[in-house]
Amino acid sequence: MQPSSLLPLALCLLAAPASALVRIPLHKFTSIRRTMSEVGGSVEDLIAKGPVSKYSQAVPAVTEGPIPEVLKNYMDAQYYGEIGIGTPPQCFTVVFDTGSSNLWVPSIHCKLLDIACWIHHKYNSDKSSTYVKNGTSFDIHYGSGSLSGYLSQDTVSVPCQSASSASALGGVKVERQVFGEATKQPGITFIAAKFDGILGMAYPRISVNNVLPVFDNLMQQKLVDQNIFSFYLSRDPDAQPGGELMLGGTDSKYYKGSLSYLNVTRKAYWQVHLDQVEVASGLTLCKEGCEAIVDTGTSLMVGPVDEVRELQKAIGAVPLIQGEYMIPCEKVSTLPAITLKLGGKGYKLSPEDYTLKVSQAGKTLCLSGFMGMDIPPPSGPLWILGDVFIGRYYTVFDRDNNRVGFAEAARL
């Protein structure tokens, strides 16, 4: 082939849309709950002073049945990554949350008394050449109050690649993304947060104001080869980064064996059928089968209050404060395994998997990784498989086939 004949081919390659496998490092931080506990604050006080529960607003009815509501809060979120908004990108740390569908960050126009806003990074539309005004007001309800602001449109870079933080990991730019500029964050909840905002990765059905979620926009713009994303969360508390979110594929170095998939039972949250929960000491919960949400924005395992109370008793955990249960650290190795059956397959959690070592008042405590919360019918009861489970089992979210995949996570 003559050199001149290579030119048209090269031009075609340059003009073709770029599909990418995007890696976003995840960093582990101390949750709001632990931060407040370590300084003597009470989560009950937080709840009284400012709402923390996730979406409680009504969602427009569709043909697939009722939407689960008030599933969780961000008190226990522990992993964040970095994105950019605007041109040039303004960098923000966000929780990549499969339990919600909206992107929001603090606005430079936040209220004077919004302390949480002033101690986090803020989006400034005047500094972006790709900003498009929208102005529609939005409210995300958190119990008795709401996070509010207005919608804007701009380019979202994943991960953030500003001139001062160029990344060798590759990335994508999602154009014409509508997001929330938060001008009011309720109560004092978000003051203790190590993250600036939230990037929701659930289905469009639960998106506030029917805003197209970032990953859906990314799919429409054909920025990845496969419409899937996967999470590896390191169980090593000192590991940096603390994990990785991959857009467009999976990485076999992060798991052992093969992936096993379950179909999504309701395309709102990433909801799957849970066959049952077995404690090796003989207790069986969710005996007739139940529904579960796979949620990267929650660090704990969450289940109905009465059933989780039985589980805590079976593993010898005693109530502490703020809904937490304590286990004597010297007894952790003797505790029974807990197995979740999903799709007919058992996913075992060892005592080391489902207990958490934390510091409080200068002492090391061991806490149960399970917490009780009732989701009322018709949406509930529901279990939430949070980072305790995802850290043990590499998790793939497949929008092409509407399914969730699990495989035993590798220890790196």
From Swiss-Prot:
Disulfide-bond pairs as recorded: 91-160, 110-117, 286-290, 329-366
Expression sites by tissue: Expressed in the aorta extracellular space (at protein level). Expressed in liver (at protein level).
Active site: 97, 295
Domain of life: Eukaryota
Catalytic activity: Specificity similar to, but narrower than, that of pepsin A. Does not cleave the 4-Gln-|-His-5 bond in B chain of insulin
GO molecular function terms noted in the UniProt entry: aspartic-type endopeptidase activity; aspartic-type peptidase activity; cysteine-type endopeptidase activity; peptidase activity
Glycosylation sites: 63, 134, 263
Class of enzymatic activity (EC top level): hydrolase
GO BP terms in the entry: antigen processing and presentation of exogenous peptide antigen via MHC class II; autophagosome assembly; execution phase of apoptosis; insulin catabolic process; insulin receptor recycling; lipoprotein catabolic process; positive regulation of apoptotic process; proteolysis
Propeptide segment residues: 21-64
Domain Peptidase A1 residues, every copy: 79-407
Gene Ontology CC annotations of this record: collagen-containing extracellular matrix; cytosol; endosome lumen; endosome membrane; extracellular exosome; extracellular region; extracellular space; ficolin-1-rich granule lumen
UniProt-annotated location(s): Lysosome; Melanosome; Secreted, Extracellular space
EC number(s) reported in the record: 3.4.23.5
Signal sequence segment: 1-20
Pfam families: A1_Propeptide (PF07966), Asp (PF00026)
Reported function: Acid protease active in intracellular protein breakdown. Plays a role in APP processing following cleavage and activation by ADAM30 which leads to APP degradation. Involved in the pathogenesis of several diseases such as breast cancer and possibly Alzheimer disease.
Record's subunit section: Consists of a light chain and a heavy chain. Interacts with ADAM30; this leads to activation of CTSD. Interacts with GRN; stabilizes CTSD; increases its proteolytic activity.
Protein name, entry field: Cathepsin D
Gene: CTSD
